[in-house]
A protein has these predicted regions:
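Charge-lined substrate channels and their catalytic hotspots, especially those that engage the 3′ end
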Residues: 1-282, 289-334, 373-374, 670-671, ...
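Electropositive polyanion-binding surfaces
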Residues: 32, 180, 186-187, 213-220, ...
Length: 709
């Protein structure tokens, strides 16, 4: 049954069950009512199951399909390692007590009823009444042999039960192995889940096993199917010169790439000149779509992965290295096919004309961010002499970048400049150092030029009114903005809200006002938390954080599938145009592409964050007993989170604050002593001692050093 037929049948069945004369029936009875033959009943049951999963219909305790009770909600259960959990329903987290979980496991899709409405300062509470679908079918954990059988202790502490492994499902696992387990039975009140070992990742102490375990736990694919590797062998190492007449030739332009020293996938290049006061900026992006054809094995795998994943000891690429480091890498001194966005920009930063075309380029020089910084910021004579033929271009790049940045700032673009970190590992994968990583002049220049190209391409294709993929950042929820406004008022700041909406310029002005103040870090973090997460959509809804009306991701087709997808659309439109049939095709596939791309981006971000937390905890486990300066980055009822200058964050549990009984003030994000009235608040500088760190739990424990507050 195709998607169209499936959706049509869902609509018919949904209307039947919501008819006022309908009475609850079992699936077999509905089949008889609709004269569905026995051989087609499985299709009917799939439709019924889909409607239940979507929460559109319900199932009684006797297995009869019924109208969904308005008091029954459907959502995803998020467990905790303390037994209780939350069900996320349309963005709201509903608290579930341990006794009300109905044996639901982490990520299960469930139905629940509300048992306690929202009270001041407290969430709504609920009770799970039915598990609709289990969310985790595979678990990564440590294998423990126990006689003839075994158990796997899940790495994910939110999966609260050990998994029983029968004797014939152990494979060759031994105690201490990290394994991937397929769950065959999810258990109940009296039985643990049961599963089988499907992969052995290595011993828990083997180098790299810890990070591979995270990769597996997020189900991130890291090995390419055989058909992909066969396809990649057919891709040439050099461009097809017979296609040169069909492309715009930009090989005569002075063109450079600027990347990290170790980068091998150079997918963007820049050309720039100035004539009669007009800047001619060229952003040239590797033409990956020339080699990754729609519906090929390569394309299907790229879509499946969605994005490259950057972990501290490895990169899991979206596309094989032979492609990303070879024909699609804009290497110095070789001809390469590209998609070029050529922009004419006036002295105010306004893009007055542009041209998007398939092109051929030849990069004159491969530069690093460090070298360009030495030229523009450090005025390093040796570096300037080494690249003397390109120095005028770098100066011009800096000049234009400042103009573009100023124009973005004038319209309200918000720049959250939080410190990032670089974790340095030894050959055995142990963390040696954690260094703050800051953007320099060169990285900002490239960001400015990429933003300009992304906006230009987005606006061009918006007005063409053809299906496209946009990068969207929605306006923050009014409740979160009102909470932020109330909080910053404690510090004497205010933001203007009109018709329950806020303009990004208001938040930009707030960032400018707090710059350099003690509360800067605190208010910046709370402002960021008030923002929604950006994602991919087929509608052009704008980008709130950039204050941009039109925005897309055009500049990284090697590592992001949405970029590759729009390259394909652009190339098609540049040729004979997009036919009605192809427009219909894109209208059908792009909603799923954008949804999947947003999900895989979130998965990659979560995995990267998890690995960082794990390595930071491992780093701190070697520094227990040492004292550090830090800043309070979070305040909760259970304690204080303190962030160190190297971005490591740890918890001072409220039980460690033994000099008084501390009460949490949710409105001001403070813990205050009942007797002493001593307060701990966000942004406050403290001295802490590391008292514990768990690589397994990804946690760091601190204790306030009283004498040094």
């Amino acid at each position: 049954m195709d998607d169209y037929t499936f959706e049509k049948r869902k609509k018919v069945i949904n209307e039947l069950i919501h008819d006022k004369y309908y009475t609850p029936m079992k699936g077999k009875e509905i089949a008889m009512l609709l004269n569905v033959s026995k051989e087609n009943r499985n299709d009917l049951y799939k439709v019924l199951d889909a409607l239940v999963l979507e929460g559109k219909i319900g199932v009684t305790s006797k297995g009869k399909y019924c109208k969904n009770d308005k008091n029954i909600l459907t959502g995803i259960f998020q467990s905790t390692d303390r037994g209780f959990g939350f069900v996320t329903v349309e963005g709201e987290d509903i608290f579930i007590r341990e006794s009300d979980t109905c044996n639901a496991l982490h990520q299960d899709k469930v139905q629940l009823v509300i048992t306690c409405e929202k009270k001041e300062g407290r969430r709504r509470e609920g009770r799970i009444i039915r598990i609709l679908e289990h969310g985790m079918n595979q678990i990564v954990g440590i294998f423990r042999k126990n006689g003839a059988y075994g158990f796997v202790i899940p790495d994910n502490r939110k999966f609260s039960k050990d998994i029983f492994i029968p004797k014939d499902k152990i494979r060759s696992a031994v105690t201490g192995h990290k394994v991937v387990v397929k769950i065959n039975s999810f258990g109940d009140d009296t039985h643990n889940p049961e599963g089988e070992v499907i992969r052995i990742l290595g011993h828990v102490n083997d180098p790299g096993t810890d990070i591979l375990s995270v990769v597996e736990s997020y189900e991130i694919p890291y090995e390419y199917p055989e058909e992909v590797m066969k396809e990649i062998e057919k891709i040439p190492d050099e461009i097809d010169e017979t296609k040169l007449p069909l492309r715009t030739d930009y090989r005569m332009l002075q063109t450079i790439t600027i990347d990290g020293e170790d980068a091998k996938d150079l997918d963007d290049a820049i050309s720039l000149s100035k004539e009669n006061g007009i800047y001619h900026l060229g952003v040239h992006i590797a033409d990956v779509a020339e080699y990754v054809k729609e519906k090929s094995a390569l394309d299907k795998e790229a879509l499946n992965r969605g994005t490259s994943v950057y972990l501290v000891d490895r990169v899991i690429p979206m596309l094989p290295h032979k492609l990303s480091n070879g024909i699609c890498s804009l290497n110095q001194g070789v001809d390469r096919f590209a998609l070029s966005c050529m922009m004419d920009i006036d002295s105010t930063g306004k893009i007055i004309d542009h041209k998007i075309s398939e092109s051929v380029i030849n990069v004159d020089r491969r530069m690093s961010y460090t070298s360009v910084k030495k030229i523009l910021t450090d005025n390093d004579i040796d570096t300037i002499n080494e690249y003397k033929d390109f120095v005028p271009m770098f100066k011009l790049m800096e000049e234009l970048a400042i103009i573009l940045r100023k124009k973005r700032q004038q319209r309200g673009s918000i720049d959250f400049d939080f410190p990032e970190c670089k974790i340095v590992l030894d050959k055995a994968g142990r963390p040696l150092d954690i260094k703050p990583y800051e953007r320099n002049t060169a990285t900002k220049i490239i960001e400015d030029f990429m933003l300009a190209a992304n906006e230009t391409v987005a606006e061009d294709y918006f007005w063409q009114q053809i299906p496209f993929v946009y990068r969207t950042h929605d306006t923050p929820d009014k409740d979160k903005i009102n909470e932020l406004a109330a909080f910053i008022n404690n510090f004497g700041y205010s933001i203007k809200v009109s018709n329950d909406e806020i303009h990004p310029k208001e938040l930009q002005k707030l960032m400018e006002k707090i710059e350099g103040s003690e509360e800067e870090n605190l208010i910046s973090r709370l402002t960021l938390r008030a923002m929604k997460r950006a994602g991919y959509t087929v509608e052009c809804k704008g980008h709130f954080g950039l204050a941009a009306k039109y925005y897309t991701h055009f500049t990284s087709p090697i590592r992001r599938y949405p970029d590759l997808q729009i390259h394909r659309i652009i190339k098609e439109s540049l040729h004979a145009g997009i036919t009605d049939k192809r427009i219909k095709h894109y209208e059908n596939i792009l909603p799923d592409v954008t949804k999947h791309a947003s999900q895989t981006e979130r998965r990659a971000d979560d995995a990267e964050r998890e690995v960082d937390k794990m390595k930071k905890a491992e780093y701190m486990s070697l520094r227990i007993g040492k004292t550090f300066s830090g800043v309070i980055s979070g305040v909760t009822a259970w304690g204080l989170y303190v962030e160190l200058p190297n971005t490591v964050e740890g918890l001072v549990h409220v039980n460690e604050l033994t000099d008084d009984y501390y009460i949490f003030d949710q409105n001001s994000y403070e813990l205050y002593g009942e007797v002493s009235h001593k307060t701990y608040k966000l942004g406050m500088k403290v001295r802490v001692k590391c008292t514990g760190a768990s690589k397994v739990l990804r946690t760091v424990d601190f204790q306030i050093v009283e004498d040094d507050i």
